[in-house]
Amino acid sequence: MKIAAVIVAAGRGERAGGGVPKQYRRLGGFFVLTHTLLRLLHREVFDSIIVVVNPADADHIAAVEAELDIKLDTVPGGATRTASVRAGLERARDLGLDAVMIHDAARPFLGDALIDRLVKALADHPAVIPALPVADALFRGGDARMGDPVSRDGLYAAQTPQAFHLAPLLKAYARLGDTALPDDAAVIRAAGGEVALVPGEAENFKLTTRADFERAERQIMSETITVTGQGYDVHRLEPADVMWLCGVEIRAGLGLIGHSDADAGLHALTDAVLGAAGAGDIGQHFPPSDPQWKGAASDAFLLHAIKLLKQVGGELVHADITLIAERPKIGPHRDAMRARVAELTGLPEKRVNIAATTTEKLGFTGRGEGLAAQAIVTARLTT
């Protein structure tokens, strides 16, 4: 069964405040929509991820794409949630998919176990949603007075993602016309269909009010860890016109020898970022045996590592590079190196440090045979 995740991100979210649609507000360093997408992008169960957006939010979507370093499959939404979902379903149909999971962009804490429950239930049911039993006492009220109690027996709170076989859901939407209903399960019910339930997750709450965002910030903090990555690289020194080091061109009669541009500073930094992401080392991603990387600028290696870090929910917060060599002298180039590394990583310059040292004439660096670089990065990672 080929499944699409359809993310409904066309709403305005005015009750949450903040001046921008809530899916584009910052939460723990990332956009809310970025958090939501990160919960889905790593799951191989999805053959496609479709994001339904408001055409007025093009700049916001571009910012999310830049944050994730991917191109999203977006479709314009409509005036109501029902119309927006219909647009997403039509896109899934055009892609030849069999089923959909429709999810609110403002539910950034979707868990893997819930996705697994929905996929399993789809094998036996054409429509299935997550739900939580109502736990609070209920009563009717009005004019600031408490009325009659309402039994909680059999009452549930619906969540998303809501999962459906695509063909019957499209038929239900065709019968619906322009009527607006609160969710997709209601569309199936209005067409006479049945909807199965699986247990939801209390953490999978929707961001609607300022209080919800305050709760979400606390949850993000509880799910965020600080990680470090370390990298080390060495290249041989030989007479040459140009040396590339920390992304800066240096003309000191020496060059670093290697398969790519041999920028030991950026190579060490790339390995450090890959380490923070748990993504191996530079040789795995850019093997020196591959001719396409011969003479390549090391900028591309670092940007790839940062992309992988973002894709696992990581955010780089600090980078420290130590260059170990008798020559060339690093001092005259330190500021340019710092600025270039800050530009490549997206960090402010105050969170980038370039240090230099020697080995007091000892070893291969002391003899001027080579240059070594060590890098350590700090990153925040949402677990």
From Swiss-Prot:
Organism equals Maricaulis maris (strain MCS10) (Caulobacter maris)
Decide whether keyword Lyase is in the record.
Answer: yes
What reactions does this protein catalyze?
A: 2-C-methyl-D-erythritol 4-phosphate + CTP + H(+) = 4-CDP-2-C-methyl-D-erythritol + diphosphate; 4-CDP-2-C-methyl-D-erythritol 2-phosphate = 2-C-methyl-D-erythritol 2,4-cyclic diphosphate + CMP
Task: Look up the record and name the pathway of this protein.
Answer: Isoprenoid biosynthesis; isopentenyl diphosphate biosynthesis via DXP pathway; isopentenyl diphosphate from 1-deoxy-D-xylulose 5-phosphate: step 2/6; Isoprenoid biosynthesis; isopentenyl diphosphate biosynthesis via DXP pathway; isopentenyl diphosphate from 1-deoxy-D-xylulose 5-phosphate: step 4/6
Q: Does the keyword Metal-binding apply?
A: yes
Question: Which residues does the annotation list for site: Transition state stabilizer?
Answer: R15, K22, H259, T358
| UniProt region (2-C-methyl-D-erythritol 2,4-cyclodiphosphate synthase), positions on chain | 227-383
Q: Which family does it belong to?
A: In the N-terminal section; belongs to the IspD/TarI cytidylyltransferase family. IspD subfamily.
So where does a divalent metal cation get bound? D233, H235, H267
- Which segment of the chain is annotated as a signal peptide? none
Q: Where does 4-CDP-2-C-methyl-D-erythritol 2-phosphate bind?
A: D233, V234, H235, H259, S260, D281, I282, G283, T357, T358, T359, E360, F364, R367
GO process terms (BP):
isopentenyl diphosphate biosynthetic process, methylerythritol 4-phosphate pathway; terpenoid biosynthetic process
Report what the protein is called: Bifunctional enzyme IspD/IspF
- Stated EC number for the protein is 2.7.7.60, 4.6.1.12
Name the PANTHER family on file: 2-C-METHYL-D-ERYTHRITOL 2,4-CYCLODIPHOSPHATE SYNTHASE, CHLOROPLASTIC (PTHR43181:SF1)
The record, for HAMAP family, names: IspD, IspDF, IspF
Q: Which GO molecular function terms does the record list?
A: 2-C-methyl-D-erythritol 2,4-cyclodiphosphate synthase activity; 2-C-methyl-D-erythritol 4-phosphate cytidylyltransferase activity; metal ion binding
Entry function? Bifunctional enzyme that catalyzes the formation of 4-diphosphocytidyl-2-C-methyl-D-erythritol from CTP and 2-C-methyl-D-erythritol 4-phosphate (MEP) (IspD), and catalyzes the conversion of 4-diphosphocytidyl-2-C-methyl-D-erythritol 2-phosphate (CDP-ME2P) to 2-C-methyl-D-erythritol 2,4-cyclodiphosphate (ME-CPP) with a corresponding release of cytidine 5-monophosphate (CMP) (IspF).
Q: Which cofactor does it need?
A: a divalent metal cation
Q: Where is this site: Positions MEP for the nucleophilic attack?
A: R152, K206
Check the record and name the Pfam families matching this protein: IspD (PF01128), YgbB (PF02542)
Keywords carried by this UniProt record: Isoprene biosynthesis, Lyase, Metal-binding, Multifunctional enzyme, Nucleotidyltransferase, Transferase
Known InterPro entries for this protein? IspD, IspD/F, IspD/TarI, ISPD_synthase_CS, MECDP_synthase, MECDP_synthase_CS, MECDP_synthase_sf, Nucleotide-diphossugar_trans
Ranges for region 2-C-methyl-D-erythritol 4-phosphate cytidylyltransferase: 1-226
